[in-house]
């Protein structure tokens, strides 16, 4: 990892937890040592964004897990970037594979959400990744480049964007991409940014890995030159999340 890219660890709590056990988790995180050169962000369920922001130390930022592409309106069940900011959160996760594949969000919609969230001043954790059949068909690059292009077309300022590579076959399955597999895709993504955006953006943009990251797998993954951090699912609800935060130490 280049010295200019601050290590980034995001915890995606998904649709898990209640105030009692999330409060206990927050107590653990507040007591944890967060290295000065590591940025930590937690994404609680929407109902608990306010709760998490009030309870978490300032050293840990808060993200929403999703948002819509407009400011206000008749969009039952949706939240806007302005609402997210009003609750004290500063980031949003967009394009997660569960949004794409469970809820049918298109590349186009994700791109529109990215544009609106950035325009409203949120940082964006933009997720991309291939399914198992796509990897086995040898089209990983094609899939992730297409997804990245739609995101890139909607980004003016890359300083507020973290790109999260999450191979869909490794999310919640216990299968982790090997450090070499992760590095290979991250390196190609950085190459794509260099060719299609700019060398400066390629060098400065953090590309993080997601997909069954645990306390046991994080150190070797973190040692790869183009792996700039993690987006963590299940393990972010456990005390081992502290080990992942300290993966570079």
Swiss-Prot record:
Coiled-coil ranges from the UniProt annotation: none
GO CC annotations, alphabetized: cytosol
Record-listed 3'-nitrotyrosine modification sites: 68, 209
EC number(s) per entry: 5.3.1.1, 4.2.3.3
Membrane in keyword set: no
Annotated catalysed reactions: dihydroxyacetone phosphate = methylglyoxal + phosphate; D-glyceraldehyde 3-phosphate = dihydroxyacetone phosphate
Residues where Phosphoserine is found: 80, 106, 159, 198, 212, 223
Cross-linked sites for Glycyl lysine isopeptide (Lys-Gly) (interchain with G-Cter in SUMO1): 142
Modified residues (N6-acetyllysine): 14, 156, 194, 238
Domain of life of the source: Eukaryota
Pathway given in the UniProt record: Carbohydrate degradation; glycolysis; D-glyceraldehyde 3-phosphate from glycerone phosphate: step 1/1; Carbohydrate biosynthesis; gluconeogenesis
Subcellular location: Cytoplasm
One Pfam family hit: TIM
Catalytic center residues: 96 (electrophile), 166 (proton acceptor)
Primary localisation category: cytoplasm
Modification sites for N6-methyllysine: 194
One of the GO BP terms on file: glycerol catabolic process
Record InterPro entries: Aldolase_TIM (IPR013785), TIM_sf (IPR035990), TrioseP_Isoase_bac/euk (IPR022896), Triosephosphate_isomerase (IPR000652), Triosephosphate_isomerase_AS (IPR020861)
Keywords: Acetylation, Cytoplasm, Gluconeogenesis, Glycolysis, Isomerase, Isopeptide bond, Lyase, Methylation, Nitration, Phosphoprotein, Ubl conjugation
Modified residues (N6-succinyllysine): 149, 156, 194
Stated role: Triosephosphate isomerase is an extremely efficient metabolic enzyme that catalyzes the interconversion between dihydroxyacetone phosphate (DHAP) and D-glyceraldehyde-3-phosphate (G3P) in glycolysis and gluconeogenesis. It is also responsible for the non-negligible production of methylglyoxal a reactive cytotoxic side-product that modifies and can alter proteins, DNA and lipids.
Family annotation (NCBIfam families): tim (TIGR00419)
Family per similarity comment: Belongs to the triosephosphate isomerase family.
Name the record gives this protein: Triosephosphate isomerase
Lineage: Eukaryota, Metazoa, Chordata, Craniata, Vertebrata
